Amino acid sequence: MKGKNYKIVSLYSFFPFQENLIIDLKSKLLEIGYENDLSGLLIFASEGINGTICAEKNVIDIVINLLNKYADNRNLNIKVNFSKKKVFKKLKIKIKKEIVTMGVPEINPSENNGTYIDSANWNKLIKNQNTIVIDTRNHYEVSVGTFQNSINPNTRNFSEFPKWVDDQLDTHLENKESTNIAMFCTGGIRCEKATSLLKKKGYKNIYHLQGGILQYLDDIPKEKNLFEGECYVFDKRVALDQELEKGSYSICHACGMPVSIQDQERKEYRKGIQCHFCIDQFSDDDRKRFEERQKQIDRLKVGNHKIFKD
């Protein structure tokens, strides 16, 4: 942690959250953000809290204490990482219908969800021949890294997951009553909500990785873990490697897809303008705009570097 000034905290909690308390908490957090170097994204809804924040340790401590107070000291499922640089541009606080959008209002993860499996017992569960493993993340996240032999629902967003369950899940089950269903995601929130959905639909033996991939990589040494590749994250780092350091991926600023070092060597790739994912998505006028934007970004970087040297 030496030399790393910014503390990054990912958190979530499902609990009944009253609207007046949400509005009050948002106001207090915006005030803290205005007075301090706090950045990140927080989402509040009647079902709880979700988000990732970045700041120096003393500011993070203030925010976490405040969130604990409003969550009535419920478990915030906190995961901590560190960085030399800010990983968000600014602080955003959003009030939504759901803290992670699935679009199934009749489920209640705070009252009914699957069984947590901690990192130490996850390998044993997913190696069991009577277990199927489901990655509940989006297809572009899965392409960056996932667990061995896991099922990819190939969803563009989490709200497509219920349809995949209805259309495809049973085809992967030898026995609906006895097969273990183990699910995982980045930090735990999506797979927890997914277990609530499956229990509502009558599935048995539902498990989810406590703390998600991030906690697993923090707990399990590289030589023993079964995660392959890097873990996509929704901030400037793009992806984290097995040591939870910034990985090798960048973002295509045209389409927002993660691109590897190998992807950047492909003939279709033009920094800030296009990649092989979006080669057919944009017009020539779009690419001209992207090219001009990239030139401005490059000029700004050169200018900042010159100021720093002077």
Swiss-Prot record:
SUPFAM superfamilies per UniProt: Rhodanese/Cell cycle control phosphatase (SSF52821)
Q: Keywords, A to Z?
A: Oxidoreductase, tRNA processing
Gene Ontology BP annotations: tRNA modification
Reactions the enzyme catalyzes: uridine(34) in tRNA + AH2 + O2 = 5-hydroxyuridine(34) in tRNA + A + H2O
Alphabetical list of SMART domains matching this protein: RHOD (SM00450)
Name the domain of life. Answer: Bacteria
Q: Where is the Rhodanese domain?
A: 127-225
Gene Ontology MF annotations: oxidoreductase activity, acting on paired donors, with incorporation or reduction of molecular oxygen
Q: Where is the active site?
A: 185
Q: What is its EC number?
A: 1.14.-.-
Annotated signal sequence range: none
Q: What job does the chain carry out?
A: Catalyzes oxygen-dependent 5-hydroxyuridine (ho5U) modification at position 34 in tRNAs.
Q: Which family does it belong to?
A: Belongs to the TrhO family.
Q: Which protein are we looking at? A: tRNA uridine(34) hydroxylase
Source organism per entry reads: Prochlorococcus marinus (strain MIT 9312)
Task: Quote the gene name from the UniProt entry.
Answer: trhO
